[in-house]
Amino acid sequence: MTSDALPTTAAAAPRLPRPLAGALLSNAVFGGITAVGVPVALNAAGLSKVQIAVFFVVNAAIAISYNTLLVPRIRRAGYPRSALLATSLAVPAGLLLVRASGGHVVVLYLGGALMLFVSTLVPQLFGRVAARGGGAAQESSIARLRAVLISGYILGLILYALLAQAGLDPLLAAVAAAVLTTVCATGCPSTPAVDPDARVASAAARPRLVLVFVAALALVALLKSVDTLRAIYLPLFAVSSGVPAAHVPPVLLASAVLELAALPALTRLSSTRGSVLTLAVVALAGVLAFSILSSTQSYAALLVSQAVYAVAAAGYQSIGLLLLERTSGGPGAGASAYMAVVQIGTVLGALLPLVVTGYDPRIFLLAVGLAATALLLALTLRLAGHRF
């Protein structure tokens, strides 16, 4: 596909098989619970702001290694079910260690390393989806996959809020969700292994656009850095401002519900105008959302800013994945590239706020700057004639 070639309409994607959809859903429930649960638990265990940031940075480095070294091997082997089962089983074991660590460094980081096998699950599941169809159906496939992930994330946030309000440990529910992912994974079949000769022929037929691919990686990393900053520091900022921990998930929940509403419109925009222009719109939403939050600190402003941010959250994950699929050179390769590069964004989003003392709202000016940089990069790509 050239940079200007776009399907005029999005073909209907086949339905996701039930075991695969179940694995995606339960994995997303895990993500929804731990998005708030892990930072809050680390804070409650007495870890400082720097220690929490370092934990996420180390985890990001681990996830990068998994997705650049392990996942490509799994992809070439045809996404064997044994690999999916092994990696999914490591996730609940890791979270149990994190929960039991009490801040003990060795146990905490061993648990984090095991838990981060979660970063390999979506590439393995999406690789199975990509193997069943591609081309013009990509928007529909990714939108359907993303809708399942958002729904699970919403359910995870609801569970966190209910359990926290009841005085129960939400992380145990996350462990149960991770175990359910493994159960569903038993019904996810392998795909045919990639023949080396076919891989070489495919690369020759569709040469990698190196500079555009690197720019796409940078664009996704910037948008992920904004999302990581939000994921780590928004709950901590809210709690330090006097907002009860149980009142934070409703903010994220409202944003996630609006993600579902924004996703079809973003998919249509990508299909007709290209993923690069769509990501420019996504970055603009990030600029607006955190401009609101950095200037006004009320709970209402928190809700409004995250409602606006819903466009960014829905777009960078679905359209960003689509852009990498189209520039990475092969079905399923974009998913592992995505999961690797978002870890770089995780490092940026975790470390940059350390230049701000405490949980000051000036942290969110950094998010504005990162989103604005992503906006400029997307516009530069678009003006250069790249649509994808």
Question: Where are these predicted regions, by residue range?
Answer:
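Hydrophobic core of transmembrane alpha-helices in multi-pass small-molecule transporters
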Residues: 25, 105-122, 221, 301-315
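A late C-terminal transmembrane helix in Major Facilitator Superfamily
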Residues: 329-359
